């Protein structure tokens, strides 16, 4: 991913102690509800309640929240200004291949980078995907913080007692991997990430069972419970060397900035582009349709496609794949209309489904182009069957007719709450680096493309990943742009974290993860 403009953080003494735990929230209240503050800046609760009540907003008497040692500190971190400067990597950016890129790769602590981004990218990011540390106990997560507070400073800024401040500073400086440490780490990053999202923006967060429940609760707090979209299950692999129960899935929490705007999420059927490429090959080779259909069925079988694709195993004269859709009444607890349908070749009535037809007779006649009892358009197929308008008939009346549906008419459907991907992220990274696996369990580009491709996009929409890792997000966006002709832009952030000296990546000169990104 090193063909993108690069920026890096430089540490400076820019720390300000004027911010407190709720500085941003208070500023928003003052800007939007100035009438709720007196001349001394004191908040007048009753006036805000008057506004709420006059707007017919129901007041809830029930609420809950997740509290942990360090939450007050996490909220303070979200409000503090950056303590660094962002500088350009001029040598890299002036290279000819990087000059005109609209994408950004930033090296540094993502919390600091996010704080800088608020100035230029507030409410400008279309979509965020992050794959943060899962805190499994084996992924190397340990909270480390170089912000040099004294207990007295932290107590004053966060509004907590001195003893709590001391306990917080103890785990922030000692590399803790507790639930509290992880929550303190992730909370301010998500809080600022929300500020970057557009009103129609969406965030996807990968996680596993170790922190799922905690993450869901703080996301409800940050993004609003009403803006929760789905907890997507990602079927990732066949279990390998698992004990007890084979773990084959992870989770992806999805939240909208405003769920009233972000309504529909679509996904392309997995593997459909490979199907189109195979059919195009058959067409170029001018394989006869009957043999082409046989080869297509074998292709489906050998690649394990699901019924959403394998149903479309017929080809028309232009090699456009289509399938036969059952015309029986779909509801088991009721019956559909029954009427006589004549076969277009034999003129004998076809068998009526046990529960009746799916459509009324008028609808059937319209789709079949049947006018005054006669079919206006009859196309004979290579196997003796025929198509009349949008209805398929077998060569005799002994088989029930089916409606005709083309694969390209149904290649997209609503994003499912369970996503399965055929590709392996580890193999993809190995292929990029000559068969060498420098990353453990990277996400496959197909997953990123499914998520990012699910939302309607415009040219120059910005996509953000502030746990860039192997660069899968950037890779996926570049592939999406090639496939659909869009011009999405990405911003990827990665800490200049040293690679494990025992790993192959370090031995071959990749001293930091950023070098690989």
Residues covered by each model-derived region:
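Secondary-structure transition/capping motifs at alpha-helix termini
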Residues: 121-125, 194-201, 221-231, 454-461, ...
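Conserved S-adenosyl-L-methionine
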Residues: 68, 110, 141-154, 183, ...
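Flexible, glycine-/basic-rich loop-and-beta segments that form/coincide
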Residues: 240-310
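Short, solvent-exposed loop/turn and secondary-structure capping segments
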Residues: 117, 137-147, 216-217, 231, ...
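Conserved Class I SAM-dependent methyltransferase catalytic core
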Residues: 168-231, 491, 514-516
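Short, surface-exposed recognition loops and adjoining beta-strand edges that mediate ligand/DNA contacts
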Residues: 226-244
């Amino acid at each position: 991913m090193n063909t993108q403009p690069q920026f890096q953080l430089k540490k400076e003494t820019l720390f300000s102690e004027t911010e407190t735990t709720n500085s941003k929230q208070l500023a928003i209240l003052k800007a939007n509800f100035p009438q709720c503050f007196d001349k001394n800046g004191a908040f007048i609760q009753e006036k805000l309640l008057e506004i709420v009540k006059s707007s017919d907003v129901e007041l809830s008497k029930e609420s809950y929240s997740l509290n942990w040692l360090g939450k007050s500190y996490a909220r303070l971190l979200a409000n503090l200004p950056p303590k660094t400067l962002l500088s350009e990597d001029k040598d890299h950016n002036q290279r000819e291949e990087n000059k005109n890129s609209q994408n950004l790769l930033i090296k540094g602590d993502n919390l600091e980078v996010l704080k800088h981004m608020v100035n230029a990218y507030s409410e400008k990011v279309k979509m965020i995907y992050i794959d943060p540390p899962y805190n499994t106990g084996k992924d190397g997560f340990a909270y480390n913080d170089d912000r040099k507070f004294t207990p007295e400073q932290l107590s004053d800024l966060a509004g907590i007692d001195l003893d709590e401040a001391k306990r917080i500073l103890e785990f922030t400086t000692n590399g803790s991997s507790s639930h509290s440490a992880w929550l303190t780490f992730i909370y301010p990053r998500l809080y600022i990430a929300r500020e970057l999202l557009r009103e129609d923006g969406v965030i996807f967060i990968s996680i596993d069972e170790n922190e799922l429940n905690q993450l869901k609760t703080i996301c409800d707090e940050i993004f609003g419970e009403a803006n929760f979209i789905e907890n997507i299950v990602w079927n990732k692999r066949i279990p390998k060397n698992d004990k007890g129960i084979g773990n084959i899935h992870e989770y992806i929490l999805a939240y909208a900035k405003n769920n009233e705007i972000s309504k529909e999420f679509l996904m392309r059927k997995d593997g459909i582009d490979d199907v189109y490429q195979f059919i195009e090959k058959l067409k170029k080779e001018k394989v006869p349709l009957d043999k082409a259909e046989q080869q297509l069925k074998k292709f489906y079988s050998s690649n394990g496609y699901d019924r959403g694709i394998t149903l479309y195993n017929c080809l028309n004269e232009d090699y456009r794949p289509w399938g036969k859709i059952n015309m029986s009444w779909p509801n088991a607890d009721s019956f559909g209309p029954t009427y006589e349908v004549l076969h277009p070749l034999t003129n004998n009535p076809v068998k009526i489904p046990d529960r009746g037809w799916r459509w009324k007779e008028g609808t059937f006649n319209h789709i079949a182009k049947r006018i005054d009892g006669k079919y206006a358009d009859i196309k004979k197929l290579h196997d003796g069957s025929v198509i009349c308008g949008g209805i398929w008939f077998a060569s005799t009346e002994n088989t029930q007719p089916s409606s005709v549906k083309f694969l390209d008419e149904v290649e997209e459907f609503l994003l499912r709450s369970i996503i399965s991907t055929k590709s392996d992220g580890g193999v993809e990274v190995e292929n990029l680096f000559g068969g060498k696996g420098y990353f453990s369990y990277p996400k496959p580009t197909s997953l990123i493309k499914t998520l990012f491709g699910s939302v309607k996009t415009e040219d120059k929409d910005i996509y953000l990943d502030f746990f860039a890792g192997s660069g899968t997000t950037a890779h996926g966006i570049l592939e999406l742009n090639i496939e659909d002709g869009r011009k999405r832009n990405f911003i990827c952030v990665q800490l200049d974290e040293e690679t494990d000296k025992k790993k192959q990546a370090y031995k071959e000169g990749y001293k930091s993860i950023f070098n690989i990104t």
